[in-house]
Structure formats: C-alpha cells, structure tokens
Regions:
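Structured, hydrophobic secondary-structure cores that serve as assembly/anchoring elements
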Residues: 1-88, 99-389
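A broadly used, surface-exposed interaction patch
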Residues: 91-93
Length: 389
C-alpha cells in the first residue's frame, strides 16, 4: 500500500485475487464428409447454411452431411465446423491421420476454438467393419476433445426389432460420450422437387441440442415437447411399449404425437442401458460435465505460471467456486444452497509432493445434476509452476 503524504483524492488499482472463468461454447457442431468444393482436410467454420453454400456449394446428393448441415441450422444451430475429405467418404478418409491432421483430426487445427458435437452421417452407409472402425475412432476422439458424438443408424434399420438386434450386434460401441436415435428421418429434398429424402437424425438433433442450450442451458434435457424436429418427420411410428424397449437399451426414440408433432423423446447416452448402470446414462448430465471440465480447464491455465503451493490452491478453489456458484444460481444443479449442489477440492490431499515436484496440480469437482443421479465427480489436472520458480 503506498503512503500518501498530502491531502487529496488518490486512485489505486488493486489486483483481484479471483481469476474469472468464462464458460466455453456448448453447441458448436462438426461435420465430416465429401462436399462439392472447399478446402480439403481443413476444418472451416460456417455460421449459416447460406455461408455453407458459398464455401462448399451447398447440398449434394452424394453428401449425407450436406443435408445434416441443412437440418442443423434449420433446428437452431449457430456454428458448424465442416471438414471436407478427399477420395470418397470411406473409413480411412473419415478417420484420417493424426500426424497429417486429415479426416476428423483436421479438427485439431481449430484450436484455441473447440467443437462440442460431432456428426458423421456418411458412416451409416458403410459396411459393418468400416462403420465400427469409424464410430470407435470418433468416440475415442470425442473423449479426448470433451465432445459428444451423435451416431446415425443405417437406412436398413427401419423397424423396432431390427433396431434392437442391431444395437445388440453393436454393443461394443457403447460409450458415455455418444448417443443414438431411432428411427431415421424424412425431410423434403430441395434437389428433387416434390420428393423426400431419408436421412440420419444427427444433424437435426445437433440443431435441437444447440437450440435448447441457448434457450435453457446445456443441463436441460434435449427431449420432450420443446425438442421438436423442425423440417423433419419420423419414418416409423413408435408406441409406448416399443419406446420402453428401446429405452432399456439406451436407444432414444423419435416420435410423432398428434398434439405436438415430431419430437425427440429420449435422453440417454450409449452408456444409458439398464444393464450399464452408468453415472453418465443421461445426455444432459454428461454434456454438463463436459462443459464444466472444459470451462475449468481452459479457465485455469493461468496456474501454469504460479508456484504450486497453498496460495495457488486457494486461488483455484475461489475461482472454481465462483464459476460453480453461478451455475447453481441459474439452475444447473440440485440443492437448496451451493454447499448442497457442488464441492471443490484442491489441497495437499489431491496434490502430492510428487505432483508438486512434477509441476502438476490436481482438482476434484463434484456436482449434483438435475437428472436423477448422485453426486457426479470430475477430475481436472493442470500444469503449474514448481514451488520456488
């Protein structure tokens, strides 16, 4: 504190001890496929379908993702990353090469921007082995990027029994960062006036996620009357009994009701079957956790330059506490007070002396989601300076 020797008005800037953490975007979608034009194996951001038309020449009968992008913006999407692959939409071109940054790995190049939702509609037209390879790689990639995958089913899966059988065959693809919907959808085809086109639901649902995120928050379940499917209709009618059978296997139903029309009527991840009993069974719980993880990780990079000691741990707890309290106040968690809704641990019990010597600080965050579940716990590891540096 400076010492003032004469009367007067003095202004002093006092540094804040709490670092502000901004929430990251939640519904920026990525699409991978062949397109008529545009940069190859480079992710390009578009913020409207008109912009997509200018950059990639719009709809193409051979490009499933071009229709998915149309549906995405029609249903409320605001930002899309588009990756054009070369040589056809095969497993090899879609997955790409991590070293060369091709295929889905072209999305590495958007940093410091992020994507949150991944759709690969063309995968549904591949043979079984290629489909499995693409979806397995996409789930792994989404896990690394804290993103969520919406999986499209093949056009041949057009009855409830076929869907249940297909899901059992593809049980190896169960993952908490992915969801699947039945049935496929029918949309008007602008390239074939008066006709419709059968499409996967991923683009439509990505738009629904974005619309509901913007209106209610990422913690809101993307299902029910508000989750209407704009410009699309279901290709199979599902009754309550069939809905229950699908739900038991973690398959989300798309339904038509006389009073509300075509809507999403399920919110389970691919880890949401009754047998899995996963804490990540619900889409809003998983996506909220991904949002919190990414926001806290990105918002705590200032710790890279501070000594890894009690002062740093206190600052982290304060900064994280402000962020989580703000989420509590807008209704993201259960509980009547903040202490019931979340907790934060960052001290000598989470960060050992060995961690300190290696410049690592560990933070444990738990929260009570709105969906019926116990406290969900996430772990965040950040690089910090060594004590004395």
């Amino acid at each position: 504190m400076p010492e003032y020797l004469a009367p007067g008005v003095f202004i002093e800037e006092v540094p804040a001890c709490v670092h502000t953490i901004e929430g990251v975007p939640t519904s920026s979608a990525a699409f991978i496929d062949i397109f008529q034009q545009g940069p190859l194996n480079k992710a390009m951001q578009v913020t409207s379908f008109a912009e997509f038309e200018r950059a990639f020449r719009g709809l193409d009968a051979g490009s499933e993702a071009s229709y998915a992008i149309l549906q995405y913006f029609l249903n409320g999407g605001k930002s899309a990353w588009v990756v054009r692959v070369d040589g056809g939409a095969t497993a090899e071109t879609i997955v790409g090469d991590p070293a060369a940054k091709t295929g889905m790995h072209a999305l590495d190049g958007i940093a410091p921007n992020i994507f949150n939702i991944l759709t690969i509609p063309a995968a549904a037209n591949l043979d079984q082995n290629s489909f499995t390879a693409v979806i397995s790689a996409a789930e792994k990639y989404c896990s690394e990027k804290r993103a969520f995958l919406i999986v499209d089913i093949p056009p041949t899966i057009n009855t409830k029994d076929k869907m249940l059988s297909w899901m059992e065959t593809n049980d190896c693809l169960r993952h908490h960062n992915a969801a699947i919907y039945f049935p496929r959808l029918e949309i008007p085809d602008p390239l074939n006036a008066g006709s419709s086109r059968n499409v996967g639901a991923s683009g439509t649902l990505a738009g629904v996620y974005a619309r509901m995120d913007g209106a209610c928050g990422v913690w809101k379940t993307p299902a029910g009357g508000a989750a209407d499917l704009r410009g699309a209709s279901v290709t199979v009618q599902i009754n309550d009994s069939e809905n229950g059978a699908l739900n038991a296997l973690g398959i989300n139903a798309l339904r038509n009701f006389p009073t509300i029309g075509n809507v999403s009527w399920g919110a389970r991840t691919l880890a949401g079957s009754y047998q899995e009993a996963s804490e990540w069974k619900y889409i809003p719980v998983r996506r909220l956790a991904l949002y919190i993880e990414e926001s806290l990780y990105q918002g705590s990079k200032w710790a890279n330059f501070d000594p890894n000691d009690e002062l740093l741990w206190t600052q982290i707890r304060l900064s994280f506490g402000v962020f989580m309290t703000n989420l509590f106040r807008v209704g993201a968690f259960q509980g009547t007070k903040a202490g019931d809704a979340f907790f934060i641990k960052c001290d000598g019990t989470t960060t050992s002396q060995d961690d300190i010597d290696r410049g690592i600080v560990n933070i444990v965050v738990g929260f009570a989601p709105l969906a019926p579940a116990e406290f969900v716990v996430i772990y965040i590891q950040q690089i910090a300076g060594r004590v004395g540096e």
